Regions:
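Intrinsically disordered, low-complexity segments
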Residues: 7, 36, 40-43
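Intrinsically disordered, low-complexity segments enriched in small/polar and acidic residues
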Residues: 34-35, 39, 48-50
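Non-catalytic all-alpha helical scaffold/repeat segments
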Residues: 43-216
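Bacterial signal peptide processing site
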Residues: 24-26
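C-terminal motif of bacterial Sec signal peptides marking the signal peptidase cleavage site
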Residues: 19-22
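Bacterial N-terminal signal peptides that target proteins for export
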Residues: 2-11
Length: 216
């Protein structure tokens, strides 16, 4: 009987221990690993929605929306706008809102100090649909950017396809032709003497000199 009672006591103790362990709550940290906070999920959802909205917008709509965004500083506006200029069609911007193309180009000219050199390639590829006052303002912007950083602009032009390269050189040559061409060439030659230009970059400078002599 004693042996039987001992066996029963051991069995009961084991059962009680199993029940106790099963009822013990899991540490909070374990739940935190498997479930993300609702606030984080909401933040990710909002960011995803914003990214989706930008993805669905055309280049023209994006540039216009950044230009109209009063919450951005001029520097931030310019950087966002120039990020999306490549391949833009200025006529489409006017279809969205009349006269905005000229307003935007003139704004970029006024804020040209904020245009980073790495965005020059995007600007070169933003010549579709330019005419009249638009073309004049665009040329003025390109000419000033070339004067500010000849190395970056020459490199960007050298890496362009023929159509965009020709258009870019033409705009710069037209803008610089308002000054004395001989003086402009002299300045460029002095700069060039201290550079190690590639063959393509030298071709850009030669083409620019030709354009200075015949800007129209």
């Amino acid at each position: 009987m004693l042996k039987g009672n001992g066996f029963v006591s051991v069995a009961c103790a084991a059962l009680l221990l199993a029940v106790t362990i099963g009822c013990t709550p899991q540490p909070v940290g374990q739940d935190a690993e498997t479930a993300a906070p609702s606030g984080a999920n909401n933040g990710e959802s909002k960011q995803t929605a914003a990214n989706t909205q930008h993805t669905q917008q055309s280049k023209e709509e994006l540039v216009l929306s950044f230009y109209k965004d009063s919450s951005l500083s001029d520097e931030a506006k310019v950087r966002h706008m120039t990020d999306h200029l490549a391949g833009i069609q200025w006529g489409k911007i006017n279809e969205i809102k009349e006269h905005q193309s000229l307003e935007i180009i003139e704004y970029l000219y006024r804020q040209r100090a904020f245009i980073p050199s790495e965005s020059f390639a995007n600007l070169i590829q933003a010549s579709d649909g330019l005419d009249g006052a638009l073309s004049e303002s665009y040329a003025g912007l390109m000419g000033d950017l070339f004067t500010r950083d000849r190395t970056a602009m020459t490199r960007a032009l050298a890496n362009m396809d023929k159509t965009n390269r020709t258009q870019g050189i033409g705009s710069i040559g037209y803008a610089l032709s308002y000054r004395e061409p001989k003086e402009v060439k002299k300045e460029i030659q002095q700069w060039q003497a201290g550079q190690k230009l590639t063959t393509a970059e030298k071709d850009v400078i030669r083409a620019l000199f030709v354009k200075l002599d015949n800007p129209y």
